[in-house]
A protein has these predicted regions:
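Juxtamembrane helix-start elements in MFS-like secondary transporters
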Residues: 21-30, 79, 83, 156-157
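C-terminal transmembrane helical hairpin of 12-TM major facilitator-type secondary transporters
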Residues: 54-101
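A late C-terminal transmembrane helix in Major Facilitator Superfamily
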Residues: 111-145
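Helix-to-loop junctions at the C-terminal end of transmembrane segments
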Residues: 40-53, 140
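Extracytoplasmic gate region of multi-pass secondary transporters
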Residues: 1-41, 98, 102, 132-133
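A membrane-interface helix-boundary motif in multi-pass transporters
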Residues: 138-168
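Multi-pass alpha-helical transporter architecture, strongest
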Residues: 73, 157-196
């Protein structure tokens, strides 16, 4: 979540600064992400129920996060349509990971401790939702200022996007650890929830 929700806070400005999108339309491209999630998350959840592969889906989603933020960081194809395509891929990743992550929790944690487990997950997420925007804002102001153009400060988003990509790397490491632990302990993360 730290690679997505805090990113959305800065995404409209990224669209203006890097992709030269009209400021009046800059929120439209990041706005595709929640619209896509509304449609895709239930579909991916249903897919997980039918085929399983929860840890694998989390790995795939994490790789997609790394790819998206790396593409936003690289100085290539600085045009609106590329940003739109990359944002749609981010919507896929953002839908894929939670649709596999949340149903995996009761497979790992005993039922009598589920409340504590979910509370701890939200606690960690909220630290990220509080701290990551502060970190990105500090990085932008300290290391990424460009020239003032028409009275407005410009920013280079390469370093912040690299930081978001590193959160994707962290998510990938956790997903791979879950996959390995599942192999050892047989939690059933790769098994379908709907048994025929």
């Amino acid at each position: 979540y730290s690679a997505v929700f805090p990113f959305i806070k800065y995404a409209a400005d990224l669209m203006v600064q890097k992709y030269h999108v009209d400021p009046k339309l800059a929120g439209t491209i990041p706005g595709l992400l929640p619209i896509g999630a509304i449609i895709l998350t239930p579909l991916f959840g249903s897919l997980y129920d039918r085929i399983g592969k929860g840890a694998t889906l989390m790995v795939i989603g994490s790789v997609m996060l790394i790819f998206v933020h790396s593409m936003f960081a690289l100085p290539i194809l600085n045009v609106w349509w590329f940003a739109t395509v990359i944002m749609i891929v981010l919507g896929f990743a953002f839908s894929l990971v939670p649709s596999a992550m949340w149903p995996s929790v009761p497979k790992i944690i005993p039922e009598k401790q589920l409340g504590t487990a979910y509370a701890l997950i939200f606690w960690v997420q909220n630290w990220g939702l509080m701290g990551v925007p502060l970190l990105i804002g500090w990085v932008l102001n300290s290391y990424c200022k460009g020239p003032v153009v028409d009275g407005a400060q410009t920013y280079d988003y390469t370093l912040p996007m690299t930081i978001f990509a590193m959160f994707g790397v962290l998510a990938l490491i956790v997903a791979l650890m879950l996959k390995a632990e599942n192999k050892k302990k047989g939690y059933g993360l790769e098994e379908a929830n709907i048994q025929k």
